[in-house]
UniProtKB/Swiss-Prot annotation:
Gene Ontology biological process terms, A to Z: defense response
GO CC annotations on file: extracellular region
Signal sequence segment: 1-22
Free-text function comment from the UniProt entry: Inhibits insect, but not mammalian, voltage-gated calcium channels (Cav).
Disulfide bonds: C51-C65, C58-C69, C64-C83
Recorded domain comment: The presence of a 'disulfide through disulfide knot' structurally defines this protein as a knottin.
Keyword Ligase: no
Family: Belongs to the neurotoxin 08 (Shiva) family. 01 (omega toxin) subfamily.
Protein name: Omega-hexatoxin-Hmo1a
The organism of origin for this protein: Hadronyche modesta (Victorian funnel-web spider)
Major subcellular site: secreted
Tissue and organ expression note: Expressed by the venom gland.
Propeptide span(s): 23-45
């Protein structure tokens, strides 16, 4: 067995052991994160609102933090929509 095969075997073994241990903390996939207390689960799934910053290309007006897009010339002289 060469080094690469050994490393792959160890990764597979670690994955299998990790899955077995994970089953102990969750009853089923529908229950998701029942074993986490409320605050920890909120930290996992908390996401900041995503918006496009000023002078970045924008396909839609609602993606801009400012809420509006205008056509502006880029460095090549082409007109592109950019957030205000």
């Amino acid at each position: 067995m060469n080094t690469a095969t050994g490393v792959i075997a160890l990764l597979v073994l670690a994955t299998v052991i990790g899955c077995i241990e994970a089953e102990d903390t969750r009853e089923d996939f529908q229950g998701g994160f029942e074993s986490y207390d409320g605050e920890a689960a909120e930290k996992i799934f908390r996401r900041a609102p995503v918006c496009t910053r000023t002078d970045q290309p924008c396909p839609y007006n609602e993606d801009c933090c400012s809420g509006s897009c205008t056509l502006k010339k880029n460095e090549n002289g082409n007109l592109v929509k950019r957030c205000d």
